[in-house]
Amino acid sequence: NLFFYDRLGHTISPFLLLDYAAPYHFEPTTAQQGVGTHPHRGFETVTIAYQGEVTHKDSSGGGGTIKAGDVQWMTAGGGVLHQEFHSPEFAHQGGLFEMVQLWVNLPAHSKMTPAKYQAIEATDIQSIRLDDVGSELRVIAGQYQETIGAATTFSPVNVWDGKIVAGQAHTFYVAEGHTTLLVLLSGELILNDEQTIEAPSLVVLSREQIDFKIQAEQDSKFLVLTGQPLNEPIEGYGPFVMNNKAEIMDAINDFNRGKFGVMDRQFILILITYKKAHNSFRVIDFRYKVLY
């Protein structure tokens, strides 16, 4: 993880987690590679594909294959089961795989919203030229200048996906009071003419800042994530992120009762036995159940 809420907490709100799968070459295979069926509740997952392909399916009926440049924005809301594997075509051919998965928290009043899926193709994402030599910014969510992002969100959030050519510089303007995260995926940048950043890195900017400047020492790939802090309690337990322990208990019980839906003919992980002690939860038994 480049960041995770258990370490940074409200500092990164409304964002929770960012996983970066750096470029890796996969050999051709007939085996399924990825993440099997698992649950989520209380937040959204955003998968950005740079290289390779992922086939996704969830219990709300959403799904599809995301290819290079595409984005999958899934709202887990009140509960969803889903799975993500390399697409059969990519697995058969092999090749470079590179992706980001971002978790975005949902406000308390929206945590039980129905699950939904936004399949955003590369052609649906507007791109802005930052200079005349190839630097650009894709507006996945929110707004940059007059350009509106393709994704809809539950709270004010910007997700900007950028690349900048070595020797070029650009200044970004952000809302005062908002969380601003600069995630450098590859390359090397100088921030505000003074701080050198080497990939992979996360920089959390002050909420009092309204702008920041980056200058590329190398060709660089980065994300700018900004959002209005939720200022609500965060209670997380594995694939569930709620506001208190009682809601986590409800999530576990609802999952065990099948309220997250069904993925036909898949192995479903059941958090069947847990123990409450000293104000914490500890799973003491795992079981698998085959649903047909």
Segments the model singles out, each with a brief description of its role:
Residues N1-A277, F281-I284:
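Jelly-roll (double-stranded beta-helix
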Residues Y274, K289-Y292:
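Short, positively charged and aromatic/hydrophobic N-terminal segments
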